[in-house]
Structure formats: structure tokens, C-alpha cells
Design a protein with these regions (language model features):
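Cyclophilin-like peptidyl-prolyl cis-trans isomerases
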Residues: 1-184
């Protein structure tokens, strides 16, 4: 039987635009201002997953130098860094970091979003090649990449720890994500 897909059309968490995600990694902490007013579905989804501990102990599983560092795939949960690296490069048969997702998908929110700019330090919801297929994986943009502005939802920007973002490598871990702000 095929996988049942559902969209998070209306996450329970309603962003107010004042949320900040404190992403604690094995390399240090990154603080990200979330764009809750501009992309409420994406931020609501991210906040709910973070508050449920979904991202705890996941690894960053892909890096394209000067472009992106990708994390949030549940396939990497508790995998040692060397295994994440080996699996990401095809060295472990049957383990494919980057293919895992939460039990739902969400709609894209880049269209009409004036803040949807891939700048150095932007946090972006990753998705499959199909529209409206984002779930839980995200990436940090490591440079300006306007060619992606109309393809992926940018849901925040790094306000502290850009040096940490640039230091992240495949196998580095998300220890936990804490949401701060007036309604967190």
C-alpha cells in the first residue's frame, strides 16, 4: 500500500512574527529570526516539530560548498558522524540521508513573500522536486542564490551565529532547537 500524504493546511501553532529559533548544534548555537507573518504554515510546522523534539539528535547530511548545508532528515537520528558521511556518499547500502520526512507535508509559501530571498544565512524549507512537498528538512543558504527565490520557502534569517552556519559539515548534529518569543 502506498504512503498516505496529508498537508498541514493549518498548524495548531499560529506564529505572531516575533519568534526566534535557537538552533543548538555540535558546532555552536545559531539564532534565526523566523518569518511567521510571511510564511505562517512553514513557521508553524517548524515550531511544532522543534517543540516536539523532532529535530533533537538529527545530523546535517548534505553540504554543497558555497551553496547550502542541509539538515532535519529523521534518517540520521543518532547516526554517528562518520556513518552520516558514509551514507550521504553512498557508502552504506540501504541508508539514504535526505529521504526521510515527518508524517506530513506542507504547502510552499514563497510566492508573494517579499522576504523570500536566498541570502547568506537564510534558513529555507527543503522539498522534493514536486511543489508542496516540504516536510521537515531545511537548509541554510551559504551565499546569495537568487535563482532559488521562486522555488523554495525562505522562512527565516540568521541573526547570530553565521560563523557557526559556515562551520557546519556533514555529520554535525542538531542538539536541540528552542523557540523563543512572546508566544513560544
Amino acid at each position: 500500500m502506498g504512503k498516505v500524504e496529508r498537508f498541514v493546511a493549518d498548524p495548531e501553532y499560529k506564529p505572531n512574527g516575533g519568534e526566534v529559533a535557537s538552533i543548538e548544534t555540535s558546532k555552536g548555537t545559531v539564532k534565526v529570526e523566523l518569518f511567521g507573518r510571511e510564511c505562517p504554515l512553514t513557521v508553524g510546522n517548524f515550531v511544532e516539530l522543534a517543540q516536539a523534539g523532532f529535530y533533537d539528535a538529527l545530523a546535517f547530511h548534505a553540504r554543497k560548498e558555497g551553496s547550502v548545508i542541509v539538515g532535519g532528515c529523521p534518517t540520521t537520528r543518532n547516526m554517528p558522524p562518520n556513518q552520516v558521511y558514509m551514507a550521504a556518499h553512498g557508502g552504506i547500502y540501504g541508508v539514504h540521508p535526505g529521504t526521510g520526512e515527518a508524517e506530513h507535508r506542507i504547502k510552499d509559501e514563497w510566492e508573494g513573500n517579499p522576504l523570500n530571498k536566498h541570502l547568506d544565512g537564510s534558513i529555507v524549507m527543503a522539498r522534493k522536486s514536486a511543489p508542496d512537498s516540504a516536510s521537515c528538512q531545511f537548509y541554510f543558504s551559504l551565499s546569495g542564490q537568487p535563482e532559488f527565490d521562486d522555488k523554495f520557502t525562505v522562512f527565516g534569517r540568521t541573526v547570530e551565529g553565521l560563523d557557526v552556519v559556515h562551520a557546519l559539515r556533514v555529520g554535525d548534529r542538531i542538539e536541540r532547537i528552542v523557540i523563543e518569543g512572546p508566544t513560544a
